[in-house]
């Protein structure tokens, strides 16, 4: 940027079309958050009506994560081939239909399947909306674009909590899911009123369609075996999270099978840059493992261990969700100021100071608990607002939507494991201690993975010929791409 440009307030660097693109994507993400968290709010009611165990009830939250990897791959490829806008609209319709189906579910199995549909739509919305906004905004503002966008999910969760306190006590839990069909109206408006992302238009102007991840996996020479592996992964995940398997060795074996399949898909689709993709999946996996036990089971903790009524639960969740939303925006400013990775690490370190007090204070003072949750979620959960920017920077425009969608949503299986892991630990400890212990310990893993830039570092160790030394979104250097003690010019930026 020139000196004269730097003196202009950041928001004036954006034109009306860019603000309209952001507003549309943000509203879509708000609706996504609204639909997705409904199950967490009514989990105890659903558990009581269907006669479920705590682990079975938690698996309904996990179900949406089980299908996310395929939704991210499929709808991400749609975004790479046909444009970010179409993928975003299709995703909204998909998760809205799944939410409506939850309202009509007669039992556990039907609701589990509906949650699978929601997961596919959510995955597509995440990848398509994130790439759409990031590619529509100027490079020096793309951490803000990412953070501001992801705040919509937390705002949607806050809105859902308030609607829950008004609707469920009067009309029951099913009525809450019927409201979730409304985003379809918004999707139809989006289809006609928003422009395509600038980066995507420039990349594809007058050119032949790109070869997407779907083309590579399901139309290439290994398509038969890849289709079989897709069904195998789906079946393995089903048995792990819905099959009520009691044998830990079998569950571990099925999990290992899924890991091998996902790594195989990453190797095929990313070529020599597969080490980067695999490490990004690990980053996201641990990011979900530290954050989603609280996200998924906080309402249950408030209702069961603290004995809060629905109105008080909604008030506490307001502080939590609003803190995460504010944190996404703060993370955007920090990311553009400090750099994406440094901002992430600093925010997570600060959040660690608050996680133990949140669950040690008990339920006697609602306002103090609410304030602690606000700041803990602002620092710990809110910084995830710049995660799409962090991941997207490792992929070129041609593969960004599918790369971000698949990588993020395979890693998001940590969100499927997290509530079940929290529920299992809570069988030996109280739920609050289980949630605090998981979050506190696993946050340090994420700090190390991001702080040391392990995706670039492992790429340099295993396949240095395909190393990317600079972020593809904002052109800033990757610290892990340069060995310690080397000069800044040790590597040349690659165009993979």
From Swiss-Prot:
Keywords for this protein: Cell inner membrane, Cell membrane, Membrane, Sugar transport, Transmembrane, Transmembrane helix, Transport
Job of this protein: Catalyzes the proton-dependent transport of sialic acid.
Membrane topology: Multi-pass membrane protein
Source lineage: Bacteria, Pseudomonadati, Pseudomonadota, Gammaproteobacteria, Enterobacterales
Keyword Transport in annotation: yes
Location within or outside the cell: Cell inner membrane
Gene Ontology molecular functions: carboxylic acid transmembrane transporter activity; sialic acid:proton symporter activity
Listed InterPro entries: MFS, MFS_dom, MFS_trans_sf, SA_transporter
Listed transmembrane segments: 22-42, 58-78, 86-106, 116-136, 148-168, 170-190, 224-244, 247-267, 278-298, 313-333, 353-373, 374-394, 406-426, 431-451
Family recorded in the similarity comment: Belongs to the major facilitator superfamily. Sialate:H(+) symporter (SHS) (TC 2.A.1.12) family.
Reactions accelerated catalytically: N-acetylneuraminate(in) + H(+)(in) = N-acetylneuraminate(out) + H(+)(out)
Protein name stated in the entry: Sialic acid transporter NanT
Superkingdom field: Bacteria
CDD domains listed in its UniProt record: MFS_SV2_like (cd17316)
One GO CC term, this protein: plasma membrane
Keyword Cell membrane: yes
């Amino acid at each position: 940027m020139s000196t004269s440009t730097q003196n202009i307030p950041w928001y004036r660097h954006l034109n009306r079309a860019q603000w309209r693109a952001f507003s549309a994507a943000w509203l879509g993400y708000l609706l996504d958050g609204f639909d997705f968290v409904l199950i967490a709010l009514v989990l105890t009611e659903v558990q009581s009506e269907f006669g479920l165990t705590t682990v079975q009830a938690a698996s309904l939250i996990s179900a949406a994560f089980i299908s996310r990897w395929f939704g991210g791959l499929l709808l991400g490829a749609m975004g790479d081939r046909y444009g970010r806008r179409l993928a975003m609209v299709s995703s909204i319709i998909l998760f809205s239909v799944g939410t409506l189906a939850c309202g009509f579910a007669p039992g556990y199995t039907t609701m589990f399947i509906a949650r699978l549909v929601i997961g596919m739509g959510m995955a597509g919305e995440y990848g398509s909306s994130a790439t759409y906004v990031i590619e529509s905004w100027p490079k020096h503002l793309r951490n803000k674009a990412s953070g501001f966008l992801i705040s919509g999910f937390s705002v949607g969760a806050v809105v859902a909590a308030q609607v829950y306190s008004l609707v469920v006590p009067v009309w029951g839990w099913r009525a809450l899911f019927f409201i979730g069909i409304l985003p379809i109206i918004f999707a139809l408006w989006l289809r006609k009123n928003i422009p395509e992302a600038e980066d995507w238009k420039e990349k594809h102007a007058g050119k032949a369609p790109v070869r997407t991840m779907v083309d590579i996996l399901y139309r290439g020479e290994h398509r038969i075996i890849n289709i079989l592996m897709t069904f195998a992964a789906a079946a393995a995940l089903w048995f792990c999270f819905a099959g009520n398997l009691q044998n830990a060795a079998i569950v571990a074996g099925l999990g290992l099978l899924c890991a091998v399949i996902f790594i195989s898909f990453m190797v095929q689709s990313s070529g020599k840059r597969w080490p980067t993709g695999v490490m990004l999946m690990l980053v996201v996996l641990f990011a979900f493992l530290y954050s989603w036990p609280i996200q998924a089971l906080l309402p249950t903790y408030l209702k069961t261990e603290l004995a809060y009524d629905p109105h008080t639960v909604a008030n506490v969740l307001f502080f939590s969700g609003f803190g995460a939303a504010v944190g996404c925006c703060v993370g955007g400013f920090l990311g553009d100021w400090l750099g994406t990775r440094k901002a992430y690490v600093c925010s997570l370190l600060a959040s660690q100071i608050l996680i133990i007090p949140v669950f040690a204070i008990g339920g006697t003072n609602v306002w103090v608990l609410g304030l602690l949750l606000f700041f803990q979620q602002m620092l710990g959960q809110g910084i995830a607002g710049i995660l799409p920017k962090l991941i997207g920077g490792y992929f070129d425009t041609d593969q960004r939507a599918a790369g971000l969608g698949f990588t993020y949503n395979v890693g998001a299986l940590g969100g499927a494991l997290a509530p079940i892991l929290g529920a299992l630990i809570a069988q030996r400890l109280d739920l609050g201690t289980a949630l605090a212990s998981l979050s506190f310990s696993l946050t340090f893993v994420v700090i190390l993975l991001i702080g040391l830039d392990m995706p670039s570092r492992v790429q340099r160790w295993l396949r240095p010929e395909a190393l990317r030394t600079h972020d593809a979104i904002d052109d800033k250097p990757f610290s892990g791409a340069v060995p310690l003690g080397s000069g800044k010019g040790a590597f040349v930026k690659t165009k993979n």
